[in-house]
């Protein structure tokens, strides 16, 4: 059944899809992701069907205090680094190398544990010569694709909760969407 679908990725430029199907997917909170001619996700369909909790959620989101944002960011970074550690373990690498980073994240990640851990993570996973870049050599394109799919899944969950993914906590720039 359609309600069991979490995500549909439309990659091929020759795809034909009907409006009733798109409406049914959106109605069932399916993340419909559209890709460009390089098969990179560029956008996602979202429901504009307003409900009473959406307005309340948006008001709450806009009113979040700076200390609360910093604590939320701290928790996100701790989880991100802990998950990177788990990936290293699954890849047969030393997962404990990231422990000092996720155990010492400060409010708002004021001393950039995320960035420091990322360097250690990527070097551990792919070797010291690997450089993580938006348009870099492989496997960057695959990582970027996966990241776009994950970002769409998070956006879907936020939208489903009445929150706007565009109003992030930090990481605001043209190239990096709000987080």
Model-derived regions: residue spans:
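Glycine/small-residue-rich interface belts in oligomeric ring/scaffold proteins
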Residues: 2-56
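Active-site helix-to-loop segments that bind/position phosphate- or nucleotide-bearing substrates
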Residues: 27, 39-178
